[in-house]
């Protein structure tokens, strides 16, 4: 399980497992204020095929192909597309893409801080928030990519929760 903006951190986690069909690949995107609000960065839900940085991929864009402005409370996830590898994983259904809104991610960031002493980057908090969406079998081994440093997001946490 890893968060996906452009997808570099998730690519590092997934790469060696992609040919192993026993491994479920879960990509967690930022739904921002909600998929239908116009303030989201959920490329799998809102994107279509396009070109960015010379690569054909899934991209949030207007009808005439102009890139639209994504939104996420997490600066690391507000990217208007996903890397070509993730676009392939989405199209081929090799990865499951889930969109998590700001509120759920922030709640999980606070929960991890209070219960585990881990201050996750807000990007990582999005990945952990899927625990509200699904349960895993106790016999499964589940990897969460805990990337980034939450201390860089302390001001955002403090402002958001009015701490």
How should each PLM-predicted stretch be described?
Residues 1, 11-18, 25, 158:
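Short, well-ordered alpha-helical packing segments
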């Amino acid at each position: 399980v890893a968060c996906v903006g452009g997808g570099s951190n998730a690519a590092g986690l997934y790469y060696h497992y992609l040919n192993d069909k026993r491994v479920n690949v879960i990509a967690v995107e930022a739904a921002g204020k909600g998929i239908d609000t116009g303030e989201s960065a959920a490329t799998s839900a809102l994107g279509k095929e396009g070109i960015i940085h010379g690569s054909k991929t899934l991209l949030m864009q207007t009808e005439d192909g102009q890139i639209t402005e994504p939104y996420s409370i997490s600066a690391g996830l507000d990217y208007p597309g996903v890397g070509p590898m993730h676009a392939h994983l989405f199209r081929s259904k090799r990865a499951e893409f889930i969109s998590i809104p700001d509120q759920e991610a922030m709640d999980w960031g606070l929960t991890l801080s209070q219960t585990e002493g881990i201050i996750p980057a807000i990007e990582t908090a999005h990945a952990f928030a899927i625990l509200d969406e699904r349960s895993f079998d106790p016999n499964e081994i589940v990897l969460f990519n805990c990337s980034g440093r939450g201390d860089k997001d302390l001001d955002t946490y403090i402002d958001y929760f009015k701490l």
